[in-house]
């Protein structure tokens, strides 16, 4: 079986209507043949909407986002690098929806019906706190 682990980071403020701009993508594929990795920062559509969290995530080196390749180019590379996998693994449903929509916007379909959401899996095993969240990030 071939697994594709995807991690996204996105820039979003509470008042933003949508999920925000993806500014970092990291993918790792595990199969019996070995492991493949790909990770990149992406250029933000609106650099003026940068949040403090995003600045902290890039260690206040904003030039990495200003000079990064466009999101479409990064996602096209991901589609070429990881053309087939059996199981897609992400942290949360929000992250899955954001990745699915971003890939769809670039003309790519996710090639699996098997999706594992670690937050939901962990929530089923670990007793959540009062607000229904797992006690760590």
Where are these regions (language model features)?
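Conserved non-catalytic scaffold segment of RNase H-like nuclease domains
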Residues: 2-96, 102
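Short coil/loop linkers at secondary-structure junctions
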Residues: 60-63, 109-111, 125
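Short alpha-helix plus adjacent loop in nuclease-associated cores
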Residues: 116-135
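Internal, well-ordered alpha-helical segments in soluble enzyme and binding-protein domains
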Residues: 74, 135-137
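Generic secondary-structure boundary/loop-capping signal
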Residues: 19, 62, 112, 118-119
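Alpha-helix capping at helix-to-loop junctions
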Residues: 80, 87, 104-108, 124-127
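Substrate-recognition/cap helix-loop segment adjacent to the acidic, metal-dependent catalytic center
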Residues: 94-115
């Amino acid at each position: 079986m071939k697994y594709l682990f995807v991690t996204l980071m996105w820039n979003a403020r509470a008042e933003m209507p949508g999920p925000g701009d993806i500014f970092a993508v990291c993918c790792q594929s595990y199969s019996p043949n070995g492991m493949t990795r790909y990770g990149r920062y992406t250029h933000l559509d609106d650099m003026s909407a940068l949040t403090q969290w995003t600045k902290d995530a890039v260690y206040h080196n904003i030039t990495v986002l200003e000079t990064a390749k466009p999101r479409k180019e990064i996602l096209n590379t991901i589609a070429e690098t990881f053309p087939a996998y059996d199981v897609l693994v992400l942290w949360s449903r929000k992250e899955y929806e954001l990745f699915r929509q971003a890939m769809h916007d670039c003309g790519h379909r996710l090639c699996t019906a098997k999706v594992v959401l670690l937050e939901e899996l962990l929530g089923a095993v670990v007793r959540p706190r009062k607000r229904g969240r797992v006690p760590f990030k």
